């Protein structure tokens, strides 16, 4: 009974009334040192993850192929998951650089972020610019940049009838999204907003409607970096063979992509948090319509403490927990945390959060909640 009551509480909707606090109240509650981002400490975490990643690459390239067949079947998956997690950790540091939360020097942040994201086949400046728009319009039905839910009218099609509303269909959907979702977002803006101006909404296309004129040269620069890495991958394949390169880098990259897609999906998808159209949305409402999760396998505070990240993206991940604890008493019911295990939460959200619509009889029709009844 206790567990059922706890689950019910987790799914209780957050209040939609005006919060009894202001943004400045939250900022004053955060200890000032949480906004500091010392260069030495940030580089310590960066070098730690780079060293572990390099060691894993070295072991996978030189020792795992020498193992007996039966043993390699066990060790390879352990390597893939471990390396995928550490590539994801490096990617998150690059993401921090885009928020200027790595150091006090923007040129350092952009240099480090560019190198890290390029190595993980992410166009740094392109993602930085589109992600900035996500933070500026979080949970806006019209203007958010990623994981925009479908309205009920859009969900009434064959895809949702046959894939989204039965266990086998949900499993196929989940596997496809985890495998291809991140790459599809970067290449084709999958789950992103529809741009009225038309054009290819790709992070690789400088003329994409995702960017303004002042950003296009940086997008092109990001593309050049990606091309260099792809050429390096090609040269490695020529030396080691396609299968070896796929085992050592390709599969861990897919694992990293799955982690990133799942983490961001879960941070913005939950039965208890609303989305808003232009009649109801404001920045604070959007920032509070995110949810903290316990994605322990990822071991990165930006994945655990996402609410504080949207309120104060300049806070580095190693201060996120302390800053969160400082504002929780002020947030009260406006703060949402769900400790449901990762795979269970992912399955539940994909099953229960198929589309959004306003409640019948609801006075404010610009507030949308996740539902699953087709």
Swiss-Prot record:
Pathway stated in the Swiss-Prot or TrEMBL entry: Lipid metabolism; polyunsaturated fatty acid biosynthesis
GO biological process terms, semicolon-separated: alpha-linolenic acid metabolic process; unsaturated fatty acid biosynthetic process
Tissue specificity note: Expressed exclusively in the developing seeds. Not detected in leaves or flower buds.
Renumbered ranges of motif Histidine box-3: 306-310
Keywords, ordered alphabetically: Endoplasmic reticulum, Fatty acid biosynthesis, Fatty acid metabolism, Lipid biosynthesis, Lipid metabolism, Membrane, Microsome, Oxidoreductase, Transmembrane, Transmembrane helix
Keyword Heme in record: no
Annotated function: Fatty acid conjugase converting 18:2(9Z, 12Z) to calendic acid 18:3(8E, 10E, 12Z). Converts alpha-linolenic acid (18:3(9Z, 12Z, 15Z)) into 18:4(8E, 10E, 12Z, 15Z). Also has weak activity on the mono-unsaturates 16:1(9Z) and 18:1(9Z) producing two conjugated double bonds at delta(8) and delta(10) position.
Name recorded for this polypeptide: Fatty acid conjugase FAC2 A
Native species: Calendula officinalis
Lineage summary: Eukaryota, Viridiplantae, Streptophyta, Embryophyta, Tracheophyta
Gene behind this protein: FAC2A
């Amino acid at each position: 009974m206790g567990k059922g009551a706890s689950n019910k509480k987790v799914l209780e909707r957050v209040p939609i009334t005006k919060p009894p606090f202001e943004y400045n109240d939250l900022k004053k509650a955060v200890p000032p040192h949480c906004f500091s981002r010392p260069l030495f400490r940030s580089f310590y975490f960066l070098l730690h993850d780079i060293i572990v990643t390099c060691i894993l690459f070295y072991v996978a390239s030189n020792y795992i192929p020498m193992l007996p067949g039966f043993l390699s079947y066990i060790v390879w998956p352990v390597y893939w998951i471990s390396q995928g997690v550490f590539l994801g950790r490096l990617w998150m540091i690059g993401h921090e650089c885009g928020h200027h939360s790595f150091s006090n020097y923007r040129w350092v942040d952009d240099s480090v972020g560019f190198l890290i994201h390029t190595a993980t086949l992410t166009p740094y400046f392109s993602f930085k610019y589109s992600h900035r728009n996500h933070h500026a319009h979080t949970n806006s039905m019209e203007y958010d940049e990623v994981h925009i839910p479908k309205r009920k009218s859009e969900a009434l099609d064959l895809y949702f009838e046959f894939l989204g509303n039965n266990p086998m269909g949900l499993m196929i959907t989940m596997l496809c999204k985890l495998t291809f979702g991140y790459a599809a977002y970067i290449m084709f803006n999958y789950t992103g907003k529809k741009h009225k101006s038309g054009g290819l909404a790709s992070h690789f296309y400088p003329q994409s409607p995702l960017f303004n004129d002042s950003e296009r040269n940086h997008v092109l620069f990001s593309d050049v970096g990606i091309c260099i890495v792809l050429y390096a991958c090609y040269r490695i394949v020529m030396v080691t063979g396609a299968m070896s390169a796929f085992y050592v880098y390709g599969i861990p990259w897919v694992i990293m992509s799955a982690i990133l897609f799942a983490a961001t999906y879960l941070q913005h998808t939950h039965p208890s948090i609303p989305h808003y159209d232009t009649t109801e949305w404001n920045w604070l409402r959007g920032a509070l319509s995110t949810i903290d999760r316990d994605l322990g396998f990822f071991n990165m505070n930006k994945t655990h403490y996402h609410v504080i990240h949207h309120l104060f993206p300049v806070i580095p991940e190693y201060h996120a927990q302390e800053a969160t604890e400082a504002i929780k008493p002020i947030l009260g019911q406006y703060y949402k945390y769900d400790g449901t295990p990762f795979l269970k939460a992912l399955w539940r959200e994909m099953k229960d959060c198929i589309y959004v619509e306003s409640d019948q009889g609801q006075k404010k029709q610009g507030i949308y909640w996740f539902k699953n009844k087709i």
